[in-house]
Amino acid sequence: MAVARSLRSGESGPRTGSEIRTAFLTFFAERAHQVIPSASLVPEDPTVLLTIAGMLPFKPVFMGQAERPAPRATSSQKCIRTNDIENVGRTARHHTFFEMLGNFSFGDYFKQQAIEWAWELSTEVFGLNPKNLVVSVFREDDEAEAIWRDVVGVNPKRIIRMDEADNFWASGPTGPCGPCSEIYYDFKPDLGNDDIDLEDDGRFVEFYNLVFMQYNRDGEGNLTPLANRNIDTGMGLERMAQILQGVPNNYETDIIYPLIETAAGLAGLDYQKLDDKGKTSFKVIGDHCRAITHLICDGVTASNLGRGYIMRRLLRRVVRHGRLVGIEKPFLQAMGEAAIALMVEAYPQLEERRKLILAELNREEARFLETLERGEKVLADVLVANPQMISGGQAFELYDTYGFPLELTQEIAEEHGLTVDLQGFEQAMDQQRQRAKAAAVSIDLTLQGAIEQMAAELEATRFKGYQVLEQPCCVLALVVNGESAERASAGDNVQIVLDTTPFYGESGGQVGDHGVLSGEGSGGNGVIVAVDDVSRHRNVFVHFGRIERGTLALGDLVNAQVDRACRRRAQANHTATHLLQAALKQVVDSGIGQAGSLVDFDRLRFDFHCSRAVTAKELEQIEALINGWIMESHDLIVEEMSIQEAKAAGAVAMFGEKYADVVRVVDVPGVSMELCGGTHVANTAEIGLFKIVAESSVAAGIRRIEAVAGPAVLAYLNERDVVVKELGDRFKAQPSEIIERVISLQEELKSSQKALTAARAELAVAKSAALATQAVAVGEYQLLVARLDGVEGAGLQNAAQGLLDQLGDATAVVLGGLPDPSDEGKVILVAAFGKQVIAQGQQAGKFIGSIAKRCGGGGGGRPNLAQAGGRDGAALDGALEAAKVELKQSLG
């Protein structure tokens, strides 16, 4: 193994990736830094799809929007970036997935301490020779240069000043910002200190970046010193591993190389003997497998939107590069197993979610292999017909009709020396967006903006709803018609913020409470507000409602009263949701994790990660378990404790969710224990009854169970009774006889359909027998193109095959028709080619697929017999005439 040879066995200090990570965190933990576990790749920041930097989880702290977790922190954060995806595998250090080691100061130590520790860590812990190190500073940062030169003792010739584009960090056009300083490793120090060019990545690699957040930039670009200065640093784990292990690139470190070896073994190749192109494919596989394994683990499933699209794109690139190196069979499960084994020590959750990860890899790989097979056939025809460029329309058709990603079309085109008309593709995509606009739903941005502004300016609402359902409160803010207001009158739809509230605000899947606000009001004649929703914005509770009577003004005192019946129903459904998750884990799979939920007053919905449908028998078992727990009358225990205590006690958390240091734990002893901020019954008996009403798929790898509990079960059963009674009346059968009656009718219908199909087939054969006389001679060949309506696809194929058998191997038969002559929206086309026609280079599948496009469709099949379909019956005669002309030209 190349990596094993490169590791400096016998030398002291960290060398492996695991040792480097541990050494970094230990170094800063010993210097009073709190070790923060890696956050999910799915960030809380809604403006970012994925966690792209080690500092991202701390961004709210740096921006002054959240409390600091500690004065000092350190972490090893998993990250994903895809902006340079085309460079992955082609350069020594580009990756999609990487780990960023970092140390952070939130208003504590600053520039000199950060620089001194960075140097100490690099030279004394990691053992890097100072002669191999070069540092960069911002061109105007005299302070940093002086520290490097006078305090640390770096040779002035190895301190390089850089421009703002390289060495000045900013969170945006305005806000916190500051200069950076970077440490580079010099692989060729013998070249001296003259004309150092840090852009020469063959000689230098940046491995440690120090950001000094010391300024605030206003709208005019002016910089003013921050009252609390911060430190944000990042060291690339993969880059440090390359340096310490002495290998030519990051891919051949012990962090990634085992995955490359696994893939090479599956391909039956020796990686070290491959040319650059072959090695690139294995590097892509190794890199992307790390990324997709962690993405699935963090709850991302493949889709055509957002982070789901990123995961799908990475996974499909893995499959594509696997085929390029000769891996034809499905192999992602093997790669997933290898990735989990490689990274599980640092990320134990990979083992916990192993089944989910492997199931998602298998499913998406199988789906893409089907897409790839279809798309590659079509793309092959496009490549032959377009020797220089693939048009935007063709690329869009591949994307829209066959699910073939644009990036993949570009890659394959590049391999053949072609380009893709990207502008044309975007035009086609834009036309599709315009067509979809009719279905778009707009959001009241004016109202949303007013609420967000209001929430940002107010202190957190004191929530009393766990203890009481009625509470005197003071009106702090009002929004009327999307604008902040001082008063509102009867008939106004309003949004209200109170200093204190018993109303539960929508969160954790549970809907907001309903109820009433009442008081004397500003007019003195009393005010009543009907509250029909409550939401949370930055821990401020916003009450949505309508003023039924009187006038409400800022500062008014009101009595807030929650609708007790609604609250009881929501509580029953929320506790039932916890029992449902516990039952799923017990009956279906202990590794099942929550993907989402809805807790409403009259129903509940639970989404969970699962690679298959829950069987009818399992649903029965789940129902029985839950109703058993309800009848056992378990008292619930609700406690607040530290997140560490909760996890140690076995409390279930929603994966990827970020929790405070102190959490609320809802415990149904011996049954379920979850972290939850929702409202619940005091005893399971209060739920009454539980009934599952549906189980379905909502996305790849995500299932949904819908259910009712309590009084809603009776309403559901009453509705079912009405349906059963109506069916009984229609079928003139007792309820117990309905199923038998339906089966009997189905058998009768099936028999009738079978007889009809047979009759149509006989009719097709009878009609086709007369068609043989219409065959025309084309040189040595026979050509028959005809229209035959009223025949389904199977009958049309039988007719074509019968004509071919009758006319001989030197015959081409093309038949087309409308299965239902009254419906021009469905066209069937069939081609049957004899052996001698096929020998001339004609293939029935390709030929009939191209002809079908004239009818707005497509299709294909075997070289000798193929079927296609279309949607435009009016174009059928023209398509058949085109088929006749093309075959005459090719066979004549």
UniProtKB/Swiss-Prot annotation:
Where is it localised?
A: Cytoplasm
The signal peptide here is none
MF-aspect GO terms: alanine-tRNA ligase activity; aminoacyl-tRNA deacylase activity; ATP binding; tRNA binding; zinc ion binding
**InterPro entries, per database record:** aa-tRNA-synth_II/BPL/LPL, Ala-tRNA-lgiase_IIc, Ala-tRNA-ligase_IIc_anticod-bd, Ala-tRNA-synth_IIc_core, Ala-tRNA-synth_IIc_N, Ala-tRNA_ligase, Ala_tRNA_ligase_euk/bac, DHHA1_dom
Q: GO cellular component annotations, sorted alphabetically?
A: cytosol
Q: Is Aminoacyl-tRNA synthetase among the key words of this record?
A: yes
State the SUPFAM superfamilies in the record: Class II aaRS and biotin synthetases, Putative anticodon-binding domain of alanyl-tRNA synthetase (AlaRS), ThrRS/AlaRS common domain, Translation proteins
Kindly list the cofactors needed: Zn(2+)
Cofactor descriptive note: Binds 1 zinc ion per subunit.
Q: Sorted alphabetically, which keywords does the UniProt record give?
A: Aminoacyl-tRNA synthetase, ATP-binding, Cytoplasm, Ligase, Metal-binding, Nucleotide-binding, Protein biosynthesis, RNA-binding, tRNA-binding, Zinc
Q: Which residues are Zn(2+)-binding?
A: 574, 578, 676, 680
The top EC class is: ligase
Q: Which domain of life is it from?
A: Bacteria
Q: Which SMART domains match?
A: tRNA_SAD
Entry EC number(s) = 6.1.1.7
Instruction: Specify one Pfam family.
Output: tRNA-synt_2c
Q: GO biological process: what's one of them?
A: alanyl-tRNA aminoacylation
Catalytic activity line of the entry: tRNA(Ala) + L-alanine + ATP = L-alanyl-tRNA(Ala) + AMP + diphosphate
Q: Function, please? A: Catalyzes the attachment of alanine to tRNA(Ala) in a two-step reaction: alanine is first activated by ATP to form Ala-AMP and then transferred to the acceptor end of tRNA(Ala). Also edits incorrectly charged Ser-tRNA(Ala) and Gly-tRNA(Ala) via its editing domain.
Instruction: Tell what the record comments on domains.
Output: Consists of three domains; the N-terminal catalytic domain, the editing domain and the C-terminal C-Ala domain. The editing domain removes incorrectly charged amino acids, while the C-Ala domain, along with tRNA(Ala), serves as a bridge to cooperatively bring together the editing and aminoacylation centers thus stimulating deacylation of misacylated tRNAs.
**NCBIfam families attached to this UniProt entry:** alaS
Q: Which family does it belong to?
A: Belongs to the class-II aminoacyl-tRNA synthetase family.
Under which name does UniProt file this protein? Alanine--tRNA ligase
Its lineage reads:
Bacteria, Bacillati, Cyanobacteriota, Cyanophyceae, Synechococcales
Q: Which gene encodes it?
A: alaS
